């Protein structure tokens, strides 16, 4: 696994590298996996997890595309998400604080990836 990827696209990255090395990926059609999504974390942290998801989704998307297809392709693929997040953040600025912050975190994930910062953001959870 690429240790730079904290969350999102780690499976895509692994499969891409396997294919690029002319190795095989096996599919088990009858296999089933139930993904519970953040069930290991107390529900009181749900919003913090949502912020983290949005930050890492955009960061990982930019990083993955830059790594495998180059910087220009990363901008082409991820700039529309950044522009959309910016517009939505402005739309929700005065009417919905939570949605405003979610789109702000998408923007921050993009900006940090674009300037080459590592995937540093972690949810603020106290056990």
Listing of model-derived features with the role each one plays in the protein:
Residues 4-16, 53:
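Acidic donor-binding loop at a coil-to-helix junction in glycosyltransferase catalytic cores
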Residues 5, 29, 55, 115-118:
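Generic secretory/membrane-interface signal
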Residues 6, 13, 69, 74, ...:
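Short linear sequence elements within intrinsically disordered, low-complexity coil regions
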Residues 11, 22-23, 31, 105-106, ...:
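Generic hydrophobic/packing signal
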Residues 16, 20, 24-97, 101:
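Active-site-adjacent helix/loop segment of glycosyltransferases
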Residues 99-127:
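Membrane-interface aromatic/basic loop that binds lipid-linked glycans or pyrophosphate carriers
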